[in-house]
Structures are given as structure tokens and as C-alpha cells.
Amino acid sequence: MSTNPKPQRKTKRNTNRRPQDVKFPGGGQIVGGVYLLTRRGPRLGVRATRKTSERSQPRGRRQPIPKARRPEGRAWAQPGYPWPLYGNEGLGWAGWLLSPRGSRPSWGPTDPRRRSRNLGKVIDTLTCGFADLMGYIPLVGAPLGGASRALAHGVRVLEDGVNYATGNLPGCSFSIFLSALMSCLTTPASAYEVRNVSGIYHVTNDCSNSSIAYEAAGMIMHTPGCVPCVRENNSSRCWVALTPTLAARNASVPTTTIRRHVDLLVGAATLCSAMYVGDLCGSVFLVSQLFTFSPRRYETVQDCNCSIYPGHVSGHRMAWDMMMNWSPTAALVVSQLLRIPQAVVDMVAGAHWGVLAGLAYYSMVGNWAKVLIVMLLFAGVDGANTHTVGGTEGFATQRLTSLFALGPSQKIQLINTNGSWHINRTALNCNDSFKTGFLAALFYVHKFNASGCPEHMASCRPIDKFDQGWGPVTYAEPSISEQRPYCWHYAPRPCGTIPASEVCGPVYCFTPSPVVVGTT
């Protein structure tokens, strides 16, 4: 039996009509005058032939053949994409030039350099080159070469794991510029600073020269866990620790200069991120740190044995000293996290537009890791108030609870004794009213007597009566008639020094961790 289709007779009805498709028993067919062979293999997007048990069921809707989605937007500066402006090719050539001659041969399809991009080209080229050089050593080249190749593959696996983890966590996309910002926050510090005296090492809180990171006018940025001891005019003196990494000559020195540096740094980071070249800017920044030279302004010595937290003797001071020496980095993170609320107010009031722009941009793109890094970076140099780092947290808590202090209050009652009336208590005066919190005074104004307060406050001077500016903190003479304890400008008497033999109780020796040396 012939399989050729039956020829049709040409009539007026079917002369101009489109030729019909013809199917053959073998699976072939003629479509538009072209013979098509049977398609072998499964067809994408179309359900296969149903089983006999399924033919009684209604046929479901066929799925369309999937089509490859065209990439939308930019394809560069994304995780896994090469850098623009020939950055990927340039780093590839840099790795080729840095690699030894033995690393030029390829390792085949499992070569780690096939999957590397950007800075990964340099890392993988060096590890593979080292493995090839180990393989050329006589006698032991085979085992050393195999171990070195396994090490190179392990490094590549770590790079792939880091790229996958940091590229798929929401809000935590990692970049080299993020590591550059983190390098400004803290430098890994040892738990103790030591000084060498005639071959004998003593544990001290004084910063060594290697712990000094940056020096400005009246300020020193250093690693956490120490306090600078500066020699000036043939005398050594401990500087005041404003933050765990920032010390000043005195507590009144403004930190505007350091905060402007942070403004410029965060503004540059935001601009680089907006231009999608953050990794390139971060690489330039990290490399520039290797060649940065800052002249020394001050002579730092280690003969002061400063306390990390200056102030009166308290349990909070001893606990803070112990924490700073136990883990300087942990103390730094805790201190900066607690300073974030005050830092937010300072960055708005101080018009730090670079930091505000960075926070706004990173928040809009959902990069919360960089938002936290910028907040910690600004909190690390935010020393606008005169409270030292150890007392800031305690003072903030005391200031919050003082708003709800009820103050001394009493109920006035009349008592009839033997026909005469007596008042059991005297009324509250203005001196006791000073101890009432602000919010409590608003809600309980009817419970205390404010008589005499205007007369008391008349002796206090407004702020325009004082000299403006900043400088060393001096003690006001409390014997002046204008000084009153309830005035805002009242200064207490300076602390004196008494011999330990006159102290009744334990005597503390403030080494890096306070130690009780005896009891008098």
C-alpha cells in the first residue's frame, strides 16, 4: 500500500488554498511542503503520553514551553559578574604576572582559575602556582604537589562558600568596601599592654606606639583596651578616654574633626555604592592603608599606668576595667551599641550629611549590614558630651529613671490634742522640691510647695554670662557667693589626695584589673 497522499484535483475551490499538512504512520509529516522527521527524546513543556489508566481522566492544561528570561537592568557589578572598565581582565593579567612560571600550565576542567573572577583570579593564581612549584621539587614533588593542589581546591571551595553565603543572605550582601569600613572600626588587640623595663615586662594600661592609629589636634585614635599616656613639658599625663578607641587631652575637646573624617569616608562609600564600583573603591582603600604615613604629633610613653575608666571608685568602674581587659573588642562593641541612640541625635543635630546620606541609601537598598557598620563607625567617634565611656551607660540609665522620681512628699494632717490643733509635719520647701523629677513634677504639682524657688534661682547665672569656646576643664572656686548647689553651673570642690593609712577599708591597686592589696 502506497503511503503517498492522494493527489487532489485542482478546482476553483482549492487552487488558492493553503496546502494541508499530511502525517505518515511512521511519525513523519509534511508541513508547508517540507518533510519533517520524528522528534526524538522528550519535548520540553509538553506532557508525555498518558498511561492507559489515565486516559479516562480529563486531560489537564498543557504547560507552555519555558523560555529563557532576558536579563533586566545592568549586568555588571552584580554578585558573580566581572567588574567594569576592564577590572576583571586587569586583575587576570595581574595574577598572570604575579604567578611563577610553573603555574602557566592549565589543570584541565577542574582548574580553580576557571571559576574565579576579580580578586579571586589573583588568589587562585597564587595558590595554583604554589602547587605547581611544589610539584617540581625532586623526590618529594609528587606528595607535596598533590597536597598543594588539594589546598588550592580547598581555597576555591571556601571562596565559593563565602560568595554564596554573602550573596544570598537578605540585607547582608558583602563587598570589599564593607570590609574597608570594618577595618576603620577596630584593630584586633591583645588583652594586655606590656612595657619593657630593664628586661622585665610589666602589664600596663598605657598604649604602646604600635597601638596608636591616628593623631589629630588634641585627640588620639588607638586600639581598644588601653589609654594613651602623653609626655608634655617633661611630665607624663593620662589622656581622657572619650570612647574605647578615642582619647583626648581633656574632656572638653570637641570631636568635630574626627567626625568630619567619618562624614567624608561614609559619603565616599555611598557614592561608590551608587556607582556600583564599591569593590573597586574598597580595594583601592585597603591598598592605600599599606602606604599611608601619618606624622606623629605627640610622644606616647608607658610610665603612667592609666586607668581605663577615670572617675570615682565604684563597682561600675571596676567591672568596666575588667571587661576592657578581658575582651577589648567585646567591650568596644557593647560600648558602641549603647551609644547608638545618642549618636543618632548627634548626627542629625550636627548636620553630618555624609553619614545621613549613607544610612538613607543603604536602608533603601535593604543593605542592613552596612547600615549597622555605619552606625557603629559614627558611634565610635561620637564624643560630643563630656561623660567618659565608662560612665555614659550608667549616667543614661540614671537620667532616665530620674524623670520619674517622685521626690520627697508628705501629707499634711491636722491633729486635735486636748482641744488644740497641731500640724504633724512641716510643709515641703523649695530645697526638697529640687529632688523631684521633671515628669513627676508635672503630674504631681499639687503635692509639693514651690514657695521660695524664684528667690533661690535668682542667684543662678544664664549661659550668656560665661565665656564661650573650649579648653581645659578648670575648677571654679566654690567660695564665691554666686555658687549654689542647685544651679546648673555649680562646680564641686576638687578631689584631694589622702594617704592610704588614713583610709578605713580595702585599698585598691588599679592595675589592668583592680586588685585589693590590703585592708586598713
Curated annotation (Swiss-Prot):
Residues 474-479 are annotated as: HVR2. Changing S116D: Complete loss of HBV suppression. Residues 164-167 are annotated as: Important for lipid droplets localization. Disulfide bonds join C453-C460, C487-C495, C504-C509. Residues 2-168 are cytoplasmic. The record marks F177, L178, A191, Y192, G383, A384 as: Cleavage. GO terms for biological process: clathrin-dependent endocytosis of virus by host cell; fusion of virus membrane with host endosome membrane; symbiont-mediated suppression of host innate immune response; virion attachment to host cell. Pfam families: HCV_capsid, HCV_core, HCV_env, HCV_NS1. Changing S99D: Complete loss of HBV suppression. Residues 112-152 are annotated as: Important for endoplasmic reticulum and mitochondrial localization. Changing S53A: 13% loss of phosphorylation by PKA and 19% loss of phosphorylation by PKC in vitro. It comes from the Viruses. Residues 2-59 are annotated as: Interaction with DDX3X. A motif (Nuclear localization signal) lies at residues 5-13, 38-43, 58-64, 66-71. Residues 265-296 are annotated as: Important for fusion. Residues 2-58 are annotated as: Interaction with EIF2AK2/PKR. Signal peptide: none annotated. The chain crosses the membrane at residues 169-189, 359-379. The modification N-acetylserine is found at S2. Glycans are attached at N196, N209, N234, N250, N305, N418, N424, N431, N449. Keywords: Acetylation, Apoptosis, Capsid protein, Clathrin-mediated endocytosis of virus by host, Disulfide bond, Fusion of virus membrane with host endosomal membrane, Fusion of virus membrane with host membrane, Glycoprotein, Host cytoplasm, Host endoplasmic reticulum, Host lipid droplet, Host membrane, Host mitochondrion, Host nucleus, Host-virus interaction, Inhibition of host innate immune response by virus, Interferon antiviral system evasion, Isopeptide bond, Magnesium, Membrane, Oncogene, Phosphoprotein, Ribonucleoprotein, RNA-binding, Transmembrane, Transmembrane helix, Ubl conjugation, Viral attachment to host cell, Viral envelope protein, Viral immunoevasion, Viral nucleoprotein, Viral penetration into host cytoplasm, Virion, Virus endocytosis by host, Virus entry into host cell. This is Genome polyprotein. It comes from Hepatitis C virus (isolate HCV-KF) (HCV).
